[in-house]
Amino acid sequence: FVDAYLAPVQDTLARLAKRVRQREVVRTARAAQVPGTDRADRMHPDTVFRLIDELTPADVIHVVESTSTANSFWNTVDISHPGSYFSAAAGGLGFGLPAAIGVQLAQPRRQVVASIGDGSANYGITALWTAARHEVPVVFVILRNGTYGALVSFGDRLEATNLPSFDLPGIDFVDIARGYGVPAYRACNADELRSALTEALASGKPALIEALTFHN
């Protein structure tokens, strides 16, 4: 059992804020993290999020639907502005792409970057048409590891083997995006991703980047 209190929100938060100490624990812990190592033809998710964090404005808004890379995101991305993170957690599949468009429409003066797993992206891919049709300048980054990473992780924890239909071969998100009218790029390494992100962010238009990664 716990104690519960009924109090005015604004007054309560103001009083609580005065009692909170500023700490650097998170930054110190991040500094001690050893980033993941890229492969010859694919990036570690750490690399993807590091470059997103480096190249985007300080007030960028992140919309995230990539469950299996959550640790990489939180260990790498620095969020210091209110209202800068949106995620469905376990609320349902396909949230990320359309939600990013909604957030961008609601916050036209801030850049929205949507980091979406390839498994999740397939559940809401038609949102790209809306982005193109209404020129909503979201930058969509599809982390393409070729598998339902979250389900693979669950299988590992349950010591289940030979599970079918977890792989996602043969999906070309670059061609799909261009078919909807969204400029698209493919990045296999940090240099290619840096170039693609720089161009996409400067365009002021919707863009999709297929970032080739591996399940970690």
Residue ranges and their predicted role:
Residues 2-6, 13, 71-216:
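Thiamine diphosphate
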Residues 5-8, 42:
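N-terminal donor/sugar-recognition subdomains of glycan-related enzymes
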Residues 11-28, 208:
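Flexible, glycine/charged-enriched surface loops at secondary-structure junctions
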Residues 21-104:
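Active-site diphosphate/adenylate-binding microenvironment
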